[in-house]
Each structure stands twice: as structure tokens, then as C-alpha cells.
A protein has these predicted regions:
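Conserved catalytic cysteine-centered active-site region
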Residues: 1-11, 40-48, 55-96, 105, ...
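Conserved active-site "lid/cap" helical segment
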Residues: 1-31
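A short acidic, glycine/proline-enriched capping/turn motif at secondary-structure boundaries
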Residues: 15-16, 33, 38-42
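Beta-strand segments within the central parallel beta-sheet cores of soluble alpha/beta enzyme folds
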Residues: 28-35, 81-84, 109-114, 168-172
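Glycine-rich beta-alpha junction loops
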Residues: 37-39, 114-118, 151, 160
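Short glycine/serine-rich loop segments
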Residues: 97-117
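Condensing-enzyme catalytic core mediating Claisen C-C bond formation in acyl metabolism
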Residues: 135-172
Length: 172
């Protein structure tokens, strides 16, 4: 079984790849995966320390399995990297994807971020006094953040590659 963060990311990736009109990349070395996460396998870490102590949980704790599982799921053969940079990890993964495209190192990069709710990030943000004591209310003057979980993925590709295959281009 997978950590919840990885499972969320695989679903987001599947949707992004399908939306892009792509599928299996056949190990193409010009297809890369960059995924970001604040905590990675926080749920597995939590399970391990709460008494489960299953050796398999240890392998799901780091951030590295996330991008590895995504790359395996689409058979990407290029760069596979995980970004661990708190709240900005997903955004940084998209910037990194753009850099790979601009540098000519990849034609297609699947990029995004994922995190599952667990006591690990909650405890960290609580110790920083970063959590809002009130419920989430967009467009108000809050005094902190409200944590949640989710994943998002986008397919970033060179203009030439997208144009050549007749892709729907959302932005340039």
C-alpha cells in the first residue's frame, strides 16, 4: 500500500496526464517528474510511531517515493526529483519543471505537489504558532493558516512539443 500523500499525487497525475491527452511515456528520457511536498509520508510516519511499527512504513516516510511512484506510473525516463520546501514545494516544482524545459533538458515534465493531513505537519505548524484559532474564512483578516490535504499536478511541456502534437495549451 502507498502513503496517502503518494496516493493523492498519483490521482492528480493521472488526471493531469489524461487532460493533456497523453498516456504512457515508454521510458522516454525527455519526460521528467518533479513533485513537491511539505512532509512526504507523514501518515506512514505517524502510523509507525503510534504503534504499528511495520518495516514497510519506514519506506513510505521520506518524500522520495512520491516522485518515484509517479514516474513509474507513467513510465517517465528523465529526471525524477522531489522538492521539500514546506508550503511552496508544489510551486517550486513547477518552476523547476519550467527550468528543465528552458534548459533543453526535457520536452515534458509532470510537476506538482501533495500532502496528506497528519499530526506531523499539524504539530510543526502548531509549534510555530502559525495556525488560526478560528475556522477557515476566505477573504477575511485571519491570524494564521488552516491545514488541509490534497494534491495537484500539471503537465509542463515545451511550446514546440505541445504545438507539434496539437495539444490544448492553457498558458505560455
Amino acid at each position: 500500500s502507498l502513503d496517502r500523500a503518494t496516493a493523492l499525487c498519483l490521482t492528480a497525475t493521472s488526471e493531469a496526464v489524461a487532460d493533456a491527452g497523453l498516456s504512457d511515456f515508454g521510458g522516454n528520457p525527455r519526460v521528467s517528474v518533479i513533485m513537491g511536498s511539505c512532509v512526504g509520508g507523514g501518515r506512514s510516519l505517524e502510523s509507525y510511531y503510534r504503534g504499528g511499527k511495520q518495516p514497510a512504513d519506514v519506506l513510505k516516510m521520506p518524500i522520495s517515493p512520491i516522485a518515484n511512484h509517479v514516474a513509474e506510473s507513467v513510465h517517465a525516463g528523465g529526471v525524477v526529483t522531489n522538492v521539500a520546501n514546506a508550503c511552496a514545494a508544489g510551486t517550486i516544482s513547477i518552476a523547476y519543471a519550467s527550468d528543465l524545459i528552458r534548459a533543453g533538458k526535457a520536452d515534458v515534465v509532470i510537476a506538482g505537489g501533495t500532502d496528506a493531513f497528519s499530526s506531523v505537519p499539524y504539530s510543526g505548524f502548531l509549534s510555530l504558532h502559525a495556525l488560526d484559532e478560528n475556522s477557515c474564512s476566505p477573504f477575511n483578516r485571519s491570524h494564521g493558516i488552516t491545514l488541509g490535504e490534497g494534491a495537484g499536478a500539471v503537465v509542463v511541456e515545451s511550446y514546440e512539443h505541445a504545438k507539434a502534437r496539437g495539444a490544448h495549451i492553457y498558458c505560455e
